[in-house]
Amino acid sequence: MADYLAGFYPEWVDKEENPRQIILDLGKMITNRIPVKLGFQKLNKYDPEYWGLAALLTDEQAEVALKMGVRKPKTMADMVKLTGKSEEELEKILGDMSFMGILEYNWENPTRTKQWVLPMFVPGSAEFTNMNDTILKKYPEMGRFFERMSRLPLEKVTPMVPPGGAGIGMHVIPVEKAIETENQSISVEHISHWLDKYEGKYAASPCSCRKSRLTFDEGCADDPEGWCVAVGDMADYVVETGKGGRYITKEEALEIFRKGEENGFVHQITNIDGADKIFAICNCNINVCYALRTSQLFNTPNLSRSAYVARVEKGDCVACGKCVEVCPAGAVKLGQKLCTKDGKQVEYPKHPLPSEMKWGPHMWDENYRDNNRINCYDTGTAPCKTACPAHIAVQGYLKMAAQGRYTEALALIKKDNPLPAICGRICNRRCEDACTRGSIDQAIAIDEVKKFIAQQDLDAETRYIPKKVVPSLNGSFSEKVAIIGAGPAGLSCAFYLAEKGYSPVIFEKNEKPGGMLRYGIPSFKLEKDVIDAEIDIIKAMGVEIKCGIEVGKDVTLDELRAQGYKAFYIAIGCQGGRKAGIPGEDAEGVMTAVDFLRTVGADESYPVTGKAVVVGGGNVAIDVARAAQRCGAESVAMFCLEPRDKMPASEEEIAEALEEDVTIDCGWGPKEILTENGRVTGIVFKRCVSVWDKDGKFAPAYDENDTKTVPCDRVFLSIGQSILWGDLLKGSKVELGRGNGAVADSLTYQTAEPDIFVGGDVYTGPKFAIDAIAAGREGAISIHRFVQPHSSLTIGRNRREFIALDKDNIKVEQYDNASRQIPGTRKDVDHKKSFRDAKLPFTEEQVKAETARCLGCGASVVDPNKCIGCGVCTTKCEFGAIKLHRERPECSNMIPSEKKLPYVLGNGAKQALKIKFSKKKEQ
């Protein structure tokens, strides 16, 4: 992938016939591009050094700057002598140039006399111009100017940069808590050292990288204000010259750093003045930061890395993946800790370094922001996390439960699933299907453990309400978001938006929220108080739910837009049933499964008399059959197309139905419903000879002559669901596709109407609650990025793609068999007739026994060649499994920028010799 941002210049440049020589001269003086500096390359009007300065400076201002020299402080007396201008003239010129960001000033001399400095472009004037809203609004090209000047000077030198960064740009400083116990640490490695050094002189100022990226629609959706903490005289400069600075206390600075760590931001300090001076401590987002880009794009970690390397204690790691999600360098990925069949540990590759081989553009990674979000190695990781649509940290919460850390376990689950008590009762348990333990005896009862953990949410005293983690120092976002539908996808989207600092409003057409959780799943599987408890938590997070409002009928999308809503998440599910298209299906006594379950969900006393027939073989059909039994049916018989071993319903669901005296007859499809006086009297089935065609597509074939007539009084059709749009999309650009579902981008869920996103069954067709929950989380991410103007919906986004380890290549002989725990049943409930849930949660003893069966398949693996020693990973680990170690003390060698050339060239020569002799040895 080439440099896709290359070649930009403002439109006005083409119209300028004669470039201003004084600007070309100034650009050459300031730039750090070596070919330009040495005269091998001449600047022209299309170079950023030219148009970036030409946009702002008059010839008079440029002449003053040329006389100052780069990074050579000048007092007013010096400036008068240099320019021959009066103090009054210079006050205006220097003031204007300081406001623009072309000059900075300080009082760093023995007499504390104010002095002006012409800084380098980066770090320097490129940042300062982007911090000034007035300048950036008038000259948006300055955003691209900063982007270019943070890259072009480095392209030729990056492979040669020695540890410590050689006074180039910025430098990672680790999370202080991560190195508190490191006895060998030195002062410059501690944020507290720099705060103490500049005691009382701090200012919170905007992040110039975040603001720059916004000018070309590559924002990261963070609020850019306040993340850069200026220290010393720079604090005065950013406050006094329109750079958005505000004075803060030391405590406020520490709070900014804490919030930065919560958000996974990397601390960096300026690194151009040696070990005795910095002027800013930044909290950097890898998706926009140009300083971090220097190491990540060029694959040259010396430009960023601290003296520390993260290491994982495999025995303590549970492969939750939270360190992986925040690692800015993609240095941590999920792997496995189980041995392969030959008894060996899996060996993981290390990233090549410029000290090991010839470097160049072929080794760069233009797509580093996406590639650094790859979650696991190709050899795979824990199958449970991989198989779960929400990719919950199963291994992690099992370990926490084993340790009795139940609240922490619940918190860990809610990072990926806001409805664990619900899912603990109704999930289709793909994690258990994939569980490695199943290769030995039986899979871990993962969902039962989750159900036990989530019982805390059913009690207001013990429920867990997540803390908000907001990428804004304001603590919240004001943009209004409407969610249409209070089912699992809508609730999940609302939860994660609230956690991010929004106050979304859910519009639900039914009387109560929950969607198909409430109106499509019988209470003997999912009690209503469980639904209510988890929804109450979402409300407590600041989500408003307006029931009894049908969008499209009671209020339109355009009316909501007029009320200030900036984005919409449509998650109305598949609320309609499907009929079979056969004679008699409109007779009295025929209902679709969806209609029947909705009726029973609202009124459990609804009567079903006589003989009932259920057409269908999925889990919904099982729910209908069992509900019909409880509603008083004389008998219930199920008929389905599939053979017994191919039924869509789970084995557990089928077993429960059979135990409740439901009969199941396989291999039949409906042909006709018999009626008398408009009412059902029976149903005729025809033999299904095949369900799928040779390509595996659903295409049932029948023997029309082989029929069966079944007398009955009620027929329930459980053969599919449909989407009931009503007038919701009236006047919108949303396109509909297969099954009348919304067409949307598969990553962002954005539709053809940019402010409308979709998720859950309305996009995928009928699936499971956990699929909708996973979609809701992704919808929240997209909406957050969308409503923050000029942000990218995709750059640096975690695709949530995982690979399961090879269970056939695991050494399992070392493990003893251990029986799976079975939950108890309530003695006070007739499990065949009652609508109450008869299943008990595990006891604490059962949880201990069951979690002990976990093999602990996965673990995080650090590539030390990619690690930049920021310590962000340590802030996310709940097990103390990943720690920083001071293995690269040379990376704390800070030198002034003016001395960089000997260090860079010396290291380059040293590397070249090493590579040369390495090749000779190989030969």
Give the ranges of each region predicted by the language model.
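Ferredoxin-like iron-sulfur electron-transfer modules
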Residues: 85, 116, 268-281, 297-326, ...
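A short, conserved structural fragment
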Residues: 98-109, 332-333, 882
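Short, amphipathic alpha-helical interaction segments positioned at domain boundaries
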Residues: 112-151
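Flanking helices and flexible, charged tails adjoining ferredoxin-like Fe-S electron-transfer domains
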Residues: 329-383, 398, 444-480, 499, ...
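Beta1-alpha1 glycine-rich phosphate/pyrophosphate-binding loop at the start
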Residues: 392-395, 401-402, 443-447, 483-551, ...
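Glycine-rich dinucleotide-binding loop and its adjacent helix/turn
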Residues: 453-475, 500, 533-554, 577-631, ...
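FAD-site-proximal beta/loop scaffold in flavoenzymes
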Residues: 586-609, 693-766
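A conserved FAD-binding loop/helix module that cradles the flavin
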Residues: 624, 762-787
